[in-house]
Design a protein with these regions (language model features):
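Non-catalytic signal-transmission and effector/linker regions of two-component phosphorelay proteins
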Residues: 1-10, 116-133
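Active-site beta3 strand of CheY-like receiver
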Residues: 51-57
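Hydrophobic/aromatic residues positioned on beta-strands within the core alpha/beta folds
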Residues: 86-88
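Acidic catalytic/metal-coordinating carboxylates
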Residues: 39-43, 66-70
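Receiver (REC) domain active-site loop signature in two-component systems and cognate sites
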Residues: 62
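Short hydrophobic/Thr-rich beta-strand motif most characteristic of the beta2 strand and flanking loop
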Residues: 32-39, 47, 109
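Two-component/phosphorelay signaling modules centered on CheY-like receiver
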Residues: 18-36, 103
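Alpha4 helix (beta4-alpha4-beta5 surface) of REC/receiver domains from two-component response regulators
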Residues: 69, 90-109, 116, 120
């Protein structure tokens, strides 16, 4: 008798700094996630149409599209996807306040972050009963 296959949770990481995106992807893979990294938010949006992720981790300040705009697109295209914003930029507060004023609330994690803190936050988001996105 075969044991049931446990589905890996899919996590998309979007950061315009390639080294950060790849590092987070590797950490998540080591922790058992199906992680995919993107430096272009539009590539992540396209990929989500093929495989909807369980979680989107995105930088906030990026040149092509900011992370809040990306998160709002994900909320429409992938309503079950949880979202974690990730930023080290001071300008983030204004963007977050603007999103809140438009009715969008997101979790925010400050860069740099220790991998243990990242994993703890991811577990809380993925296992919370209500949608945090």
């Amino acid at each position: 008798m075969m044991s049931p296959k446990i589905e890996k949770q899919t996590v998309f990481v979007v950061d315009d700094e390639k080294i950060i995106a790849l590092t987070l992807e590797l950490i998540l893979i080591q922790k058992g996630f199906d992680a995919r990294s993107f430096v272009d938010p539009l590539d992540a949006l396209y990929a989500a149409r093929i495989v909807a992720p369980d979680l989107l981790i995105t930088d906030v300040v990026m040149p092509q599209m900011n992370g809040i705009e990306l998160a709002i697109h994900f909320k429409v295209d992938c309503p079950n996807c949880r979202i974690l914003l990730f930023s080290g930029q001071g300008a983030t507060n204004d963007l977050i306040q603007n999103a809140l004023a438009q009715g969008h609330a997101f979790e925010l994690l400050a860069k740099p972050v220790h991998p243990d803190e990242l994993m703890e936050t991811i577990e809380q988001i993925l296992h919370s009963s209500g949608s945090r996105a």
